[in-house]
Amino acid sequence: MSAIQQMEVRINASMQSLIDFDPDVREYEIEVPSDCFALKFHLKYNPAYYISIRADHDAGRYGFQDLDPAMGDYIAGTEVPYYEYYDGYIVRLDKRQPCFEQDMHMTISVRAGSYEFGEEAYEIHLTRKCLREVRQLFRESVYDDTEYQVTVPYALYVPSDYDPAKRYPIVVALHGTGEREEPIEAILEKMAMATAWAEDSERGHNQCLVLVPQCRIHYNQEDNWTSLVQFINGHSNSPFWPFPQLKAVWNLLRKLVEEYSVDERRIYLTGVSSGGFAVYVLAMEHPNAFAGLIPVSCAANPDKISLLKGIPMWIFHSDDDPLIVPSWTLDPCLAAMDNAGVKYRLTRYPAGRIFWQSGHFAWEACYHSQEVRDWLFGQAI
C-alpha cells in the first residue's frame, strides 16, 4: 500500500483539487491565478509515515507561527506545518512586489517517510502567471477634485481596440483599507477585482472600461472611503458616512463618462472590505446610476437599505470573516434587505473555505468566476 492514498491541492474557496492524484505518479504541473498567495494540501496517508512538505522558494516554506516581526513578513521557516483548523498544510506564495515582474515558478516537495517502510516523494511544479501584459494596459493618472479639495490617483483600463463609435460598460473597482498607501500598481497585482474584467475585455468578451481609484490618506490614518475606521476607533457613530475621497470618485466617474463612450445603462460597481462599504454608500447616494453591484466582505447601512431596491447585486462573504463578522454586519444587512424587498444573490463561504490569509479575503475567489462576471454584464438599467 502506498504511504499517501490521497492528496488534494486547493486554492481559496475551491472544492476541486488542482491535481488528480495517483500514488504511482510522482510529479504534477499546476497553474494558479495571479492573486493566489497560498495553497492548501489535504492528505490521507498511512499513520506509520511522517509527512514533510517543503518548497524551493523562501515564501513557501513556513506557516503562521514562523513569522518573525523583526524580519518582516517573509522569513523562511524549515517546513510547512499542519493546521488543524483547516485540516491541511498551508503553503504560502510570495506576494512581494518584485515577484509580479515575471511568472513565478515554484516546486513543492511532499515526502512520506518511515524507518520501517522507507520513503515516498512527490513534486508539484507550480506556475503563477504575473499578468504583466494586462496590468500594463491600465494607465495611471491623478484627478484633482476642486469640489471636495482632495486628490484621487487612479488607474484606467480602456480596451486596446477602443472604438468611440461604440458604447462600453464601465466597472468601478474600490480597494480596501490596506491599499490606501500602496502604489496603484500593487492594487492591480494583488487582487483580481480590476484585472479580471480587463482580461475578458481583451479577448473580446464583455468589453468594458475599468476604473480603479485610490483612497489616499489626506488628513490622518482614519481616512478611508467611509467613516469605517473612525467608527472602529470610537470616533464616529456610524461606519457609513461618505468621506470626501468617495464623493470625489463620483465626480471622477462623471468626468470619464463625458470623455469616453460609456454606456450609462451599464455602470457597475464592486469593492472589497472597506471598498465594499463604499459600494453600498455610493449606490445609496446615487440609486439610479448603477446597473449592478458586487460587494465583498462588507456591510450596508440597514437604515437606508430601501435605496438599493431595484439594483441587482451579488454579495460575497465568509462565515468565519474575523474582521467583518457576519453576525453583526452581514446578517443584519440581509435581514434589512429581506424586510425591504431588496433582491440579491448571496455566496456565503462556510468556515475554513477561505483559508488564506483569513476568511476576510473572499475576493481571492469571487472575481475568478466567469459566471459572476457574466452575471454582472447581464445587468442593465
Give, region by region, the residue ranges found by the protein language model.
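Beta-rich interaction/scaffold domains
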Residues: M1-C130
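A domain-start/cap signature at the N-terminus of enzymes
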Residues: G72-E84, F117-I170, C208, T270, ...
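Gly/Ser-rich "nucleophile elbow"/oxyanion-hole loop immediately N-terminal to the catalytic nucleophile
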Residues: S160-K166, N224-S273
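The conserved beta1-alpha1 loop
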Residues: L174-G176, H317-S318
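Active-site machinery of serine-nucleophile hydrolases
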Residues: T177-K247
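Alpha-helical scaffolding within the catalytic cores
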Residues: L188-S201, S297-S306, D331
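Primarily recognizes the serine-hydrolase "nucleophile elbow" in alpha/beta-hydrolase
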Residues: R254-L308
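C-terminal catalytic histidine-bearing segment of alpha/beta-hydrolase fold enzymes
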Residues: V296, W314-L323, W328-I381
